[in-house]
Design a protein with these regions (language model features):
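Intrinsically disordered, low-complexity Ser/Thr/Pro/Gly-rich regulatory segments
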Residues: 1-78, 83-260
Length: 260
């Protein structure tokens, strides 16, 4: 058996992500100085969206304050940040900002402080995503494949709750946060796997589909781990996701054609 060799950290990449994390915290602190709640939320979402826009490949669109709509006019409600393939898929509408469910690859809900109420709202939002029918079929949740579809037909959407803090104390935080995540899922009548990651920037990260979590900052920044998770997911999912067909959203009756 070969002895495993510890991998040398990539200092260049780590320094970029560490700087980005500090910039997010600085943007959060700056937003605290405004008394307008809407402006606070917009500033925090924009700081994350700007980071992703600058570092994701140009093919990806990163938008804030968007709503996702499917062929039957089911809608998600406004989402803080959405990520989609803008190279192959145009937006449905720029004002208001609508994107087709078929183009949605990931979304992020940004929270100032994670509380029971905010978790409840996040899982209700996830339930609205579950109700969408991209390509006339549901999104597949992590760890819960659709038995009636092939691997290439499974449609995934990476869902994140990104919080700058939590109202829970440090002692036993990971277990306590997981406990109320499960309760929030029950509140919304969905499975905890309806959200892929719950990231608390100053505390740790939970992976509800695998029922695991970490608060070990000394090993690696949870922000870095989240970025890696997101980027790897986008590369896998977008590589097999078909392009959106406008015809899916056309009127049920279209003009007939005849030979000339």
């Amino acid at each position: 058996m070969r002895k495993r060799v510890a991998r040398k950290p990539n200092e260049a990449l780590e320094s970029v992500l560490e700087e980005a994390e500090q910039n997010l915290l600085a943007a959060f602190a700056k937003s605290q100085k405004t008394k307008h709640r809407g402006l606070k939320g917009n500033a925090r979402a924009k700081s994350i969206a700007d980071f992703l826009t600058a570092r994701l490949p140009a093919a990806y669109g990163v938008a804030t304050g968007a709503e996702v709509v499917d062929y039957a006019d089911r809608r998600s409600g406004e989402i803080d940040i959405v990520i989609f393939d803008k190279q192959r898929n145009p937006v449905v509408s720029a004002d208001p900002l609508w994107i087709a469910a078929e183009t949605l690859l990931a979304y992020i809900e940004v929270k100032t402080k994670l509380t029971v109420g905010e978790l409840n709202k996040s899982f209700i939002g996830a339930k609205q995503i579950n109700a969408l029918r991209p390509f006339k079929r549901p999104f597949t949740l992590a760890g819960q494949p659709d038995a009636g579809a092939t691997d290439n037909e499974q449609l995934r959407c990476f869902r994140t709750v990104f919080a700058f803090g939590t109202n829970l104390g440090c002692k036993g935080w990971l277990d306590n946060e997981w406990s109320r995540i499960k309760k929030a899922a029950v509140f919304a009548s969905v499975t905890p796997a309806s959200i892929d990651r719950v990231l608390v920037l100053n505390r740790g990260m939970l992976n509800p589909p695998s029922q695991t979590g970490t608060d070990q900052f000394a090993v690696s920044s949870v922000f870095q781990q989240w970025v890696f998770n997101l980027v790897n997911f986008l590369a896998r999912e977008n590589g097999r996701r078909p392009a959106w067909d406008w015809q899916l959203y056309a009127k049920s009756k279209i003009p007939g054609w005849r030979a000339l």
